[in-house]
Swiss-Prot record:
InterPro entries named in the record: BXL (IPR044993), Fn3-like (IPR026891), Glyco_hydro_3_C (IPR002772), Glyco_hydro_3_C_sf (IPR036881), Glyco_hydro_3_N (IPR001764), Glyco_hydro_3_N_sf (IPR036962), Glycoside_hydrolase_SF (IPR017853), Ig-like_fold (IPR013783)
Gene source species: Aspergillus oryzae (strain ATCC 42149 / RIB 40)
This protein's name: Exo-1,4-beta-xylosidase xlnD
Thermal dependence of catalysis: Stable at temperatures of up to 45 degrees Celsius and is inactivated gradually above 45 degrees Celsius.
Pathway(s) this gene product operates in, as recorded in its UniProt entry: Glycan degradation; xylan degradation
Family per record: Belongs to the glycosyl hydrolase 3 family.
Active-site residue numbers: D310
Cited SMART domains: Fn3_like (SM01217)
Gene: xlnD
Amino acid sequence: MPGAASIVAVLAALLPTALGQANQSYVDYNIEANPDLFSECLETGGTSFPDCESGPLSKTLVCDTSAKPHDRAAALVSLLTFEELVNNTANTGHGAPRIGLPAYQVWNEALHGVAHADFSDAGGFSWSTSFPQPISTMAALNRTLIHQIATIISTQGRAFMNAGRYGLDVYSPNINTFRHPVWGRGQETPGEDAYCLASTYAYEYITGIQGGVDANPLKLIATAKHYAGYDIENWDNHSRLGNDMQITQQDLAEYYTPQFLVASRDAKVHSVMCSYNAVNGVPSCSNSFFLQTLLRDTFDFVEDGYVSGDCGAVYNVFNPHGYATNESSAAADSIRAGTDIDCGVSYPRHFQESFHDQEVSRQDLERGVTRLYASLIRAGYFDGKTSPYRNITWSDVVSTNAQNLSYEAAAQSIVLLKNDGILPLTSTSSSTKTIALIGPWANATTQMLGNYYGPAPYLISPLQAFQDSEYKITYTIGTNTTTDPDSTSQSTALTTAKEADLIIFAGGIDNTLETEAQDRSNITWPSNQLSLITKLADLGKPLIVLQMGGGQVDSSALKNNKNVNALIWGGYPGQSGGQALADIITGKRAPAARLVTTQYPAEYAEVFPAIDMNLRPNGSNPGQTYMWYTGTPVYEFGHGLFYTNFTASASASSGTKNRTSFNIDEVLGRPHLGYKLVEQMPLLNFTVDVKNTGDRVSDYTAMAFVNTTAGPAPHPNKWLVGFDRLSAVEPGSAKTMVIPVTVDSLARTDEEGNRVLYPGRYEVALNNEREVVLGFTLTGEKAVLFKWPKEEQLIAPQ
């Protein structure tokens, strides 16, 4: 197979030193750094629909649209020779030309737009809409926005597939949690909260991509990744390929898997990706407890849903994990444990050998390939042109709504961290006529996209947006992300700044510091940038700082510097990011987003190892995430300012008929029509009247937190149970916000991983400031809402 020899040579060279070591750097062959190592897996395009009208398959059951998807898939797989079966166990499936089955590429990306597609050089199919990164989109606190973005991505993906340039499945969304701020891929996630944010994002994104809850036909097939406990790339040489994450049963149930439960049980995702890392000694892709007991038996994963390994993760079961004695056994262990498709070469390279050695059966292989094709059948792969999505074309990609939504998402996602009143800027009739735009993000284009992006239709940098405004703009870079371009760049920037009425410094971090396979070593502002910002502040001119990037940096020096008049977090705002930033600064739009991660002080990243997965405070670990952190953050999870003033008060309808006490047995005994489980029903509605008492129209966002001392210690500081966004609240007007507080959202996780509802006193509070507080009591005996299964491996390593 193309690329196989080179990957074997590289990985074999690592074998003597890599196996069994917990702190070792490995060649990382999953990303663009070494594309030649995985050339076959990286192939794009060339996908076509089977001919069910007159081709060899047309008279077989797989083309019978009246039959069940599983039966159709099983009939197809039964036609394959063993060699053909083996050749369809990897992400680059060869199909079976003998019977008219086309090749199929499983690896398609859609993190925040169509990517890893066969883009043309110009004209039709040369671009796709590039939305903000998920870390930014989630900050908007608008679940409808998430769904709309996913819906447009799926429409564009369908158009590319219909043109033979994409597939029917996508390796998205990434629903891991941004636990530690150094993680390079935190930008791909919805933030640090698992139960509310990551789970909500998973539900809205998956149902948007798939066309609804368990839609028939599926619009596209979403893949929930990376399952599970994956949130470190290469911190301190702890490679993601070989990390063995030590996670308590309590933390696994409470933090690292609830979003996968929602993805599987509620959103009905049809694919899940197992991750590179091991958890408690067992690699995820050979972990039958994860893939069978939890995912299928407990999380209610759809019957014919399939599991794909992350790219190369099956090989990693052997090297560097050393869980299997060789690559052939790693492949056998993984398929038997429940990894149906190998994004890699281990399955097709070794299943002939594994079959000969009786490590796998034909039935093992058929099970995995049948699951893949059953999902493709659900997506209309064998339905011919009668499938409702087959008429989507390039004209559907060229949609003004898509580009407008990309801008809207960017504008809604920008967080105002600090403002002494300088923002928004008034018109040029004021003293501000000339703006000096300085910094490594000032003329950002592809920087704004983060990672996993396709070519965008256009890129509006901050510089371009401001040049198109009413202000006179002078620009100089001043400094790059981590170094000065030359010895005079900072002095040139200072000269430029002195001649302007106002300074905007656009900096922060980008994919040179945080990305796949690369974590940060610290969470400080790059010293060269902080030095220049300090010098600019010393000029005494109005100064606005844009802090860009997915991960937070310690901005305490800027927060405390009175000469830094405003601080904005812009994340990775996508193709229209520059325009959105300019419009926020000039007051054409009003900020309303909130941080979905904690901004920690710099020493946080120095006092305990980033691979410590324990959330609760312990030893040098001061506690992780807003739920357990015992220190003082620079900016709290949920922080965000407005241009106007809002007052919030409890609505007369808040709660459930103003009850303040609920018996647990009575609550759980209620009929729950419209809900799968009684605990998914709201116990009460946290209803708040919000009035704009300022002079600017603005959206309003809010988070609802619960705190309690019910149940065993230690108790979390608080936890998020809901959020919402009100649009365009006019000055002097009021709107009502309703945040349902479900029974399940009040439960805690015990040491065995069970989700338990405890009797005691509870409070629901609005935002960090606790502007509105609703207190109530749960009475009676504690009740287990969700029973964590006993952990045992159904498949022993070979």
